[in-house]
């Protein structure tokens, strides 16, 4: 910064619009939805600011209407990925030297573009691409992405302001340099906000990026790129390639200039990428930063003192919103025997009241799961539960992929606390419940801690403070985001930094300064004012 210590706007969370019947935002988003749904878009690669078409394309279809085509996207060859890397490294020469206030200005502008002129489009695109109902689209594609962009600017300046002590003899300064080389963002299908944030936060800190979105999110990724372009992200700073993830990752990770991976997705893929980075370690110019937020097997534990209606609501919302396709979605619950009959009745009532169908019909709470692979996997586990003697489906259990990938919200009750669906991440609208002896709370907490390899989110519901304290201690390492008397989903940027440990990731807390710190390499500068001219110290006489 040259000529001032600039204050950035104080970050505030974007208010969530209601989309209630009769509201102007409801009409506007539906109009945009219809226009997008009934037209076709062509999505190019983005390399050095150019829209690159390769002739090798794949079609895009909404999960709730999979025979309907809303466009095509172009697939990269290895040479495109290599070009994107070369381009990024060239762009780095100017981008990494640009004063921070200009980087801040670009991403603050992106936030306001989404809050205003692009809001309907990014929400409608997310409803189409990922089959989100309007509320789920609004809290993700609009609000969370806006929040990431605004708060990251504030976090960046907080980091820059973190400086060492100086003395009268020497002035100590830390410069938060971007990483040397280029970075790689690999993003999941389920959150448009995560897709935008992973490349944007690295670019904000002065890095250049190759971004590989999920095949199932390309349609809404295009809107993110439209916004970044209009906001003024210069050519070559964020380059986007679609296509074979293995080829793209092999090409990226083979480059000696690869300097950081920002990944969100499944645990297996992340571990494979980590392994590959390890295998290539002798080839890199620097030690690459590795940040990954991955799977979860998120829990709800109710204590015998809990309110049954509150427990049931935490299950209905926590497990089934966005068809359970949130990394934080509750997928196993432990209910004490004294509450079970009431919780069961309320949950069944709730689930039976859910309407399922296209997000265009705004009375639908449940829409489709993301793709056929996910549908088939969920159907297999549901069939398994129907056949297994230690499992019982108490509501749901049907599925139909004739028009869209629709899985009925399903509640499995098991007598075996280690039943397969108590341990495995299914990533769909299925929760498994284990009813425990109300007097075996301590043993149950131990069980919760030991049942899964993951440690992302979890919730305790209780009216008893001692029981809450007991759970907080016993489950200290079982969740990176722990909720007391709430559902385990719905983290808000700037309020609940998000991430888990164990197999759930590196826990670098998206939506916090901690995450941004991973994308800089500090340089310590000591400036001595009166430089010594004699090597002898006084003790030498
Ligand atoms: P996924 O692992 O299938 O895909 C994630 C990304 O990795 C995509 O871009 C995909 O194309 C890419 N990929 C897939 N195979 C690859 C390979 N062999 N090499 C390189 N890249 C590859 O995950 P998904 O289905 O998109 O998302 C769901 C998963 O993401 C769940 O496990 C969920 O828990 C997790 N998730 C975690 C968080 C979190 O914050 N912890 C947030 C969202 C999603």
Located regions from the model:
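Hydrophobic face of amphipathic alpha-helices that form TPR/SEL1-like repeat modules
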Residues: 1-69
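Glycine-rich loop-to-alpha-helix module at the N-terminal edge of alpha/beta enzyme cores
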Residues: 54-55, 59-61, 66-160, 445, ...
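Rossmann-like NAD(P) dinucleotide-binding subdomain of oxidoreductase/dehydrogenase enzymes
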Residues: 127, 146, 156-310, 503, ...
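ALDH superfamily catalytic-core signature
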Residues: 227-232, 254-256, 260, 267-417, ...
């Amino acid at each position: 910064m040259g000529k001032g210590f600039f204050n950035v706007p104080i970050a505030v969370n974007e208010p969530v619009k209601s989309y209630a019947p009769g509201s102007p935002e409801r009409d506007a988003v539906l109009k945009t939805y219809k226009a997008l749904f009934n037209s076709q878009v062509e999505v190019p690669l983005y390399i050095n600011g150019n829209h690159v078409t390769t002739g090798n394309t794949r079609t895009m279809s909404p999960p709730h209407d999979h025979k309907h085509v809303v466009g095509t996207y172009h697939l990269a060859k290895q040479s495109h990925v290599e070009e994107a890397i070369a381009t990024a490294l060239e762009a780095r020469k100017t981008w990494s030297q640009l004063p921070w206030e200009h980087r801040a200005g670009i991403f603050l502008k992106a936030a306001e573009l989404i809050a205003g002129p692009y809001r309907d489009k990014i929400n409608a695109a997310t409803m189409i691409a990922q089959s989100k109902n309007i509320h789920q689209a609004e809290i993700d594609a609009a609000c969370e992405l806006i929040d990431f962009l605004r708060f990251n600017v504030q976090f960046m300046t907080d980091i820059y302001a973190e400086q060492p002590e100086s003395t009268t003899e020497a002035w100590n300064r830390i410069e938060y340099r971007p990483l040397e080389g280029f970075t790689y963002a690999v993003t999941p299908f389920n959150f448009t906000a995560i897709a935008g944030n992973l490349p944007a936060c690295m670019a904000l800190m002065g890095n250049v990026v190759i971004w590989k979105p999920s095949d199932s999110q390309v349609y809404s990724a295009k809107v993110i790129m439209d916004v970044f372009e209009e906001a003024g992200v210069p050519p070559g700073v964020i380059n986007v390639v679609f296509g074979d993830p293995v080829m793209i990752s092999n090409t990226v990770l083979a480059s000696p200039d690869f300097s950081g991976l920002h990944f969100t997705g499944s645990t297996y893929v992340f571990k494979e990428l980590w392994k590959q980075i390890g295998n290539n370690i002798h080839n890199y110019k620097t030690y690459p930063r590795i940040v990954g937020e991955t799977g979860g097997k998120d829990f709800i534990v109710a204590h015998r003192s809990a309110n049954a209606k509150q427990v049931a609501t935490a299950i209905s919302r926590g497990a089934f919103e966005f068809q359970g396709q949130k990394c934080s979605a509750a997928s196993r619950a432990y209910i004490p025997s004294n509450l079970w009959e009431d919780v069961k009745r309320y949950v069944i009532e709730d689930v039976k009241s859910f309407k399922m169908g296209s997000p265009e019909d705004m009375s639908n709470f449940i829409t489709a799961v993301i793709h056929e692979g996910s549908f088939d996997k969920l159907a297999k586990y549901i069939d398994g539960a129907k056949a297994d003697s230690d499992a019982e489906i108490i509501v749901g259990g049907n599925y139909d992929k004739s028009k869209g990938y629709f899985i009925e919200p399903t509640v499995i009750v098991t007598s075996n606390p280690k039943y397969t669906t108590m341990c495995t991440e299914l990533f769909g609208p299925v929760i498994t419940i284990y009813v425990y002896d109300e007097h075996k709370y301590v043993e149950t907490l131990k069980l919760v801690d030991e049942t899964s390899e993951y440690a992302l989110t979890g919730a305790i519901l209780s009216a008893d403070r001692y029981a809450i304290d007991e759970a907080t201690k016993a489950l200290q390492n079982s969740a990176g985001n722990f909720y007391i008397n709430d559902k385990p989903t719905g983290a808000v940027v700037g309020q609940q930094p998000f991430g888990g440990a164990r197999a759930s990731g590196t826990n670098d807390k998206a939506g916090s300064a901690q995450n941004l710190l991973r994308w800089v390499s500090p340089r310590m500068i000591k400036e001595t004012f009166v430089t010594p001219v004699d090597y002898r110290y006084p003790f030498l006489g």
